[in-house]
């Protein structure tokens, strides 16, 4: 029983947050997908289990994109932003995740 709780605790660290952008909104409307920023060591099955656990929905498929950090300059110092990983989660028909705040 403690093994299940430990696994659930690890799944809570997989999803870092939703991606709110023009492209993510367009994909959500057109393809009924939701875009999440995920941990760099997460894989497709981890993301699927985490979404099903947190949002109580059924996931159809997951596509993952590794995004390299952009090179940036800070004055005379050169650096780059951190690499990120995004997951495009396709939900089964009839399933929906809403990120809008509800007023009581």
UniProtKB/Swiss-Prot annotation:
Keywords: Ribonucleoprotein, Ribosomal protein, RNA-binding, rRNA-binding. It holds the Pfam family Ribosomal_L23. GO terms for cellular component: ribonucleoprotein complex; ribosome. Gene3D superfamilies: 3.30.70.330. It comes from the Bacteria. InterPro entries: Nucleotide-bd_a/b_plait_sf, Ribosomal_uL23-like, Ribosomal_uL23/eL15/eS24_sf. GO terms for biological process: translation. GO terms for molecular function: rRNA binding; structural constituent of ribosome. Part of the 50S ribosomal subunit. Contacts protein L29, and trigger factor when it is bound to the ribosome. One of the early assembly proteins it binds 23S rRNA. One of the proteins that surrounds the polypeptide exit tunnel on the outside of the ribosome. Forms the main docking site for trigger factor binding to the ribosome. Belongs to the universal ribosomal protein uL23 family. This is Large ribosomal subunit protein uL23.
